[in-house]
From Swiss-Prot:
Keywords: ANK repeat, Host-virus interaction, Inhibition of host NF-kappa-B by virus, Repeat. This is I-Kappa-B like protein G2. Suppresses the host immune response through NF-kappa-B inactivation. Possesses ankyrin repeat domains required for NF-kappa-B binding but lacks the regulatory regions required for dissociation from NF-kappa-B and degradation. Therefore, prevents host NF-kappa-B release and subsequent activation. Belongs to the polydnaviridae I-Kappa-B-like protein family. One of its GO terms (molecular function) is NF-kappaB binding. GO terms for biological process: cellular response to tumor necrosis factor; symbiont-mediated suppression of host NF-kappaB cascade. ANK repeats lie at residues 56-88, 93-123. SUPFAM superfamilies: Ankyrin repeat. InterPro entries: Ankyrin_rpt (IPR002110), Ankyrin_rpt-contain_sf (IPR036770), NF-kappa-B_inhibitor (IPR051070). The lineage of its organism: Viruses, Viruses incertae sedis, Polydnaviriformidae, Bracoviriform, Microplitis demolitor bracovirus. Pfam families: Ank_4.
Amino acid sequence: MLAKSGFKIVLNGCLNDRGDNLAHYFSRQGDVIDLIALKEVINDDNRHLLLDYNFSQRQCVHIVVCEDKVNAIKKLKVLLEMGADINGQERKGGNTPLHLAVHSNNYKLVKWLCKQPSINKTALNYAQKTPHDIAIERIEKKINNALMEQKKWYKIMHPSGADLSEEE
């Protein structure tokens, strides 16, 4: 509709106080319908908006993964159709959308991302970690925390000072 109206839509140069352009803003605040409307006016002259970084050093794909727990997959589909980079790295940590989805324990999104043909599952962030490395670390932390909690409870239940390993 808008693109066929004959009007030239200017999308460049408009930033909010977060450094969000319109693609960032709709990724954060909008819904899927807003992104579909944006898709109508994205062209080769302004496609860079999908790859630009905001003041938090994130592209629109990172914003969706980090901030939308309900419609992330639907929004990402539209953004990717417009030309967003599924393997784009945020500038502050070098994390890709897959790194961020793993870090936030968003299993459904991780599974969907891993099925995308162009996804780089072995991308390294600035800490030289793959998404798989992050998943393993998070599991190990959970296990370690569970063991530490068990040790605390054992000491409460056995104040005599007996060591947990002595009873095994």
